[in-house]
Amino acid sequence: VTTTTVRQVIETPRRPDRTAPRETRLRALDGLRLVAALMVAAYHYGGRGGEVTTAWGSSPKDQFPTLSGYFAYGCLGVQVFFVISGFVICMSGWGRPLKSFFASRASRLLPAYWVAVVLVTAVFALPMVAFKAVAPSDALVNMTMLQQPLGVDRVLGVCWTLWAEVRFYALFALCVVLPGASRRRVIMFCAGWTLAAAIAQASREPLLDIVLMPEYASFFIGGVGLYLVHRDRRDVYAWGIVAVSFLIGQHYAVRSLWNAADPNAFAHRTTLGIVLVVAFGFLAVTAIALGWLNWANWRWLTVAGALTYPFYLVHEHLGWVVIHGLHIGLGLPSAETFALTVTSMLLLAWLMNRYVEKPLTPKLRSALAKAR
């Protein structure tokens, strides 16, 4: 008689990779979104030249002789946004079917975007506004979010970043969401995109550059890697993705934003300053991913996060109009004008969130999710 000894191995139950974990609201991430948006606003109002000079009546360097040099780093808020986006998109796409993912993203982006395009077009058409009116045909094309690849003038100055976001969503949807998210698949996606983006940069092929976005890919990829860290802080591959993404990301940021000290340049951004701001973005999302900021659980941070997207859409061009009215029209000092402009744009963002996003987003999401 042959006896077989059966050994019972007690294993800790493991959740399948394709199942989305129950996520608590990361309110610190909402707060970081608003910080990034305010960084970009500081850049648009006081950290650059161009059309904002018309709003102030002179260069922002004259309005903010001390702060303008710091405001010039605010453009890196976009890179911080991209890291946040990588984290959030991986989190929201995990365990979701493609239709649900598409419905979620479209309903999140489009209602406020459409209203922002209409608002800016209408305001710039007013005869008392000092800025160039938008052609009706261009405004209509802008409603599709495809104005940049179609070579049409942008209604919203910041919408170039949305074109980058849309391409990231498409890549993530095709490579991860459609076949089903898993740790292995996400790691392969990050590694493959990193390598492909490097090849695109070396090849200088315009089509590859459009699809793979070598200048911005590492920020999205870094955010995706940080979501893997959030799921398992001991994941060595995830930490490797984050480290490589930071190293590549800071390179592209320095290459595109550094300029030598030149009295004719608006501001001199140093290599160290650029790297530090990029590091801030990665470290802030890392702290959130590791749970170090879970104590920041105030409800107002959720409100701040809700205001970020509409604020980001309208703050630049409508902000110029407000600056011109307050500073040139009413003669208010620069500091008061700056503060009141930011406040008025936040108020407009609240109105858009309350009367546009809250009623329309769930309806659009439901309609898209039910459609065949």
What kind of feature is each model-predicted range?
Residues R7-A28, A42-Y70, M91-G95, K99, ...:
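Alpha-helical transmembrane segments in multi-pass integral membrane proteins
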Residues D30, L34-A37, V78, S85, ...:
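Residues within membrane-spanning alpha-helices of integral membrane proteins
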Residues L32-H44, L110-L126, G291, W295, ...:
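Hydrophobic alpha-helical membrane-insertion segments
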Residues A37-A42, R185-Q201, V242-L247:
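Small-polar-interrupted transmembrane alpha-helices in polytopic inner-membrane proteins
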Residues L38, V80, W114, V118-A122, ...:
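Generic alpha-helical transmembrane segments of integral inner-membrane proteins
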Residues R48-L76, L98, A103, R108-A170, ...:
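Membrane-interface helix-loop-helix regions
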